[in-house]
UniProtKB/Swiss-Prot annotation:
This is Immunoglobulin superfamily member 21. The keyword Glycoprotein applies. It comes from Mus musculus. Transmembrane segments: none annotated. Pfam families: V-set. GO terms for biological process: synapse maturation; trans-synaptic signaling, modulating synaptic transmission. Involved in synaptic inhibition in the brain. Selectively regulates inhibitory presynaptic differentiation through interacting with presynaptic NRXN2.
Length: 468
């Protein structure tokens, strides 16, 4: 009686072995892949071992967290045929072997999990198929496609009396995964303090909790500092130039007063202005990163470098933003040089203005490359502008229907960015217009003589007739 249970167990094991032999064995595995770069060729290999007859091999792409499986390739052993299910891909994959799929030019959209399903016939009956599968994650990388360095809050004015914070923004787009972004100054890496949130531009100079550090030898030496101070003294001994936005006086500057004339008077460029405060310590830099995922799987990275600007030191300093990424063989780089504006070039049209013309005075360049973008302010020396305003902000000043009274008037263009300010003066020469008799135009350039009176009477009579 005791042998009966053991006999039954032996019979069950023997039956299971017989069933396994009838069904056959099948093992499937997919060779792992390192991350690949978009545009490269990729081969997905599905290795399997079996002693049965193959029925089919099916490749799936898994999406939506595994809830959707999209057939991308099928090998049908019954008919010895293979075909693609990837209509949108226009058969970008080729069957190299029965278990291998090749993507000649992989895309970022190909990133994700894949599964290989293999089916064999059951030895006991051809109506039954035994299945096994393996899976792999295809990690597709993409190098950044663009890099740009801009100044935050640009254009911004020049600060003459107090220090102000300045921020450079490096924008890197098109990378997957997110690249590493860092800054250099004059070719040397910047040791920046990581920051989660940047201070406001008006919150005053940014401070560092680390111990005090002396001046950077690469940025400031005695010669450069002495040159800056001597230039500052020289310019202010010669008189204070026009600044950021001082309290403006409508009294004409005697040094700029010139009697009206019809001669061509060139523009007068006033020397640049420097601030009256000087830093004596190395600037402290603060760095913050932000990441914005894109709809295509890439990431836009913005690196913001903030410090307290010192025009004496930072003017003509070279800042570079560099990017490291596993899909790049060498770092990407973008450079900017901080430069204060110097000598705006003024163009006036028409070159020979007559009474009643519309005159345009335009800044069309500088004597140097300027960064960041400057802001422009126009004023009339000793008086208000033609429209009655005290100043006009913009690159182009438009004077409509200029009257004869503007002949000889002087206009000042102030170009400024956080690194400095410069003034340019130009004189407007207005010639007589033979089509407009003398004395028939008021200060707004409109007709006020007999012809104008007759025109007014005609218009009034027309209105009366229409009303009746």
């Amino acid at each position: 009686m005791q042998a009966a249970p053991s006999l039954r167990r032996a019979s069950c094991l023997l039956l299971a072995a017989i069933l396994d032999l009838a069904r056959g064995y099948l093992t499937v595995n997919i060779e792992p892949l390192p991350p690949v770069v978009a545009g490269d060729a990729v081969t997905l290999k599905c290795n399997f071992k079996t002693d049965g007859r193959m029925r089919e091999i099916v490749w799936y792409r898994v999406t939506d967290g595994g809830t959707i499986k999209q057939k991308i390739f099928t090998f049908d052993a019954m008919f010895s045929t293979n075909y693609s299910h990837m209509e949108n891909y226009r058969k970008r994959e080729d069957l190299v072997y029965q278990s291998t799929v090749r993507l000649p030019e992989v895309r970022i959209s190909d990133n994700g999990p894949y599964e290989c399903h293999v089916g064999i016939y059951d030895r006991a009956t051809r109506e039954k198929v035994v299945l096994a599968s393996g899976n792999i994650f295809l990690n597709v990388m993409a190098p950044p496609t663009s890099i740009e360095v801009v100044a935050a809050d640009s254009p911004a004015p020049f600060s003459r009396y107090q220090a102000q914070n300045f921020t450079l923004v490096c924008i890197v787009s098109g990378g997957k995964p997110a690249p590493m972004v860092y800054f250099k100054r004059d070719g040397e890496p910047i040791d920046a303090v990581p920051l989660t949130e940047l201070p406001a531009a008006s919150s005053g100079p940014v401070q560092d909790s680390r111990p005090f550090r002396s001046l950077l030898h690469r940025d400031v030496d005695d010669t450069k500092m002495q040159k800056s101070l001597s230039l500052l003294d020289t310019e202010y001994r010669a008189g204070r130039p026009y600044t950021e936005r001082p309290a403006r006086s409508l009294t004409q500057d005697p040094s700029l007063f010139v009697q009206p004339t019809t001669e061509n008077i060139p523009e007068t460029v006033v020397s640049r202005e420097f601030p009256r405060w000087v830093h004596s310590a190395e600037p402290v830099y603060f760095l913050r990163h932000s990441r914005t995922p894109g709809s295509d799987g890439t990431v836009e990275v913005r690196a913001l470098l903030t410090w307290t600007l010192n025009p004496q030191i930072d003017n003509e300093a070279l800042f570079s933003c560099e990017v490291k990424h596993p899909a790049l063989s060498m770092p990407m780089q973008a450079e900017v040089t901080l430069v204060a504006p110097k000598g705006p070039k003024i163009m006036m049209t028409p070159s020979r203005a007559r009474v009643g013309d519309t005159v345009r005075i335009l800044v069309h360049g500088f004597q140097n490359e300027v960064f960041p973008e400057p802001m422009f302010t126009w004023t009339r020396v000793g008086s208000r502008l033609l429209d009655g305003s005290a100043e006009f902000d913009g690159k182009e000043l438009v004077l409509e229907r200029v009257p004869a009274e503007l002949n000889g008037s002087m206009y000042r263009c102030t170009a400024q960015n956080p690194l400095g300010s410069t003034d340019t003066h130009t004189r407007l020469i207005v010639f007589e217009n033979p089509n407009i008799p003398r004395g028939t135009e008021d200060s707004r350039g409109s007709a006020s003589g007999p012809a104008g009176v007759r025109l007014t009477l005609v218009l009034a009579l027309t209105v009366i007739l229409e009303l009746t």
